[in-house]
């Protein structure tokens, strides 16, 4: 379900958080369209944190620490990269109003980015909204192979350690499905969301000021001990 709403012109970061708590989120038709509309999918995409699919190749890449992972150090750049055209994605739903709103959420501590660096180059990353024990993944990008996937694995580990129970992807693409994303009906999603919102999720329970090795991240996600 989606609806255009004249009240969209009155959206603030605080209103946006209340909307997320109700299971709805805003989108734009395109990056050039100044309007916004509310969306509440009949089938909601989620990532079961205990069922993230990590291929052998991806596991090797994560374990190698080839890409340096940082948290919240380049939020605006990640947002800009997610909004930019890319091969197979000539247009996006991230317009200037979306960028301003989520930058506002970042300023008050409810939006976060995970960056994957190849040397000094920002090679991939993702951003999303944190509320209670729920994390709403908004968008990701990659400039090098598997960098967005590596960022996702690091995100999953951070959410598990932080006591989160819901990783919302909003919609499921073939790419996300290959990583373990699935769809649930709106009623089940709301129940999952309501439970998650009661939890005091801590996005920084896993330290952000020092590196976490890929081996440790894989151990967290797989529920094992790093070797």
UniProtKB/Swiss-Prot annotation:
Its EC number is 2.3.2.6. GO terms for cellular component: cytoplasm. GO terms for molecular function: leucyl-tRNA--protein transferase activity. Keywords: Acyltransferase, Cytoplasm, Transferase. Transmembrane segments: none annotated. It comes from the Bacteria. This is Leucyl/phenylalanyl-tRNA--protein transferase.
């Amino acid at each position: 379900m989606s609806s255009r709403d004249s009240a969209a012109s009155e959206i603030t970061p605080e209103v946006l958080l209340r909307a997320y708590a109700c299971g709805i989120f805003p989108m734009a038709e395109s990056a050039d369209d100044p309007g916004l509309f509310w969306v509440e999918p009949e089938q909601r995409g989620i990532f079961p944190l205990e069922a993230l699919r990590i291929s052998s190749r991806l596991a090797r890449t994560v374990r190698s620490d080839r890409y340096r992972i940082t948290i919240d150090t380049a939020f605006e750049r990640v947002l800009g990269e997610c909004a930019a055209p890319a091969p197979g994605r000539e247009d996006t739903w991230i317009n200037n109003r979306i960028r301003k709103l989520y930058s506002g959420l970042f300023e008050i501590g409810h939006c976060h980015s995970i960056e994957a660096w190849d040397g000094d180059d920002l090679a991939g990353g993702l951003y999303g909204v944190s509320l209670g024990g729920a994390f709403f993944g908004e968008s990701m990008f990659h400039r090098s192979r598997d960098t967005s996937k590596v960022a996702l694995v690091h995100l999953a580990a951070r959410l598990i350690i932080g006591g989160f129970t819901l990783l919302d992807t909003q919609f499921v693409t073939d790419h996300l499905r290959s990583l373990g994303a699935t769809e649930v009906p709106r009623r089940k999603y709301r129940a999952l969301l309501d439970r998650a919102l009661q939890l005091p999720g801590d996005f920084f329970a896993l330290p952000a000021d020092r590196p976490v090795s890929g081996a440790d991240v894989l151990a967290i996600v797989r529920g094992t001990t790093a070797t």
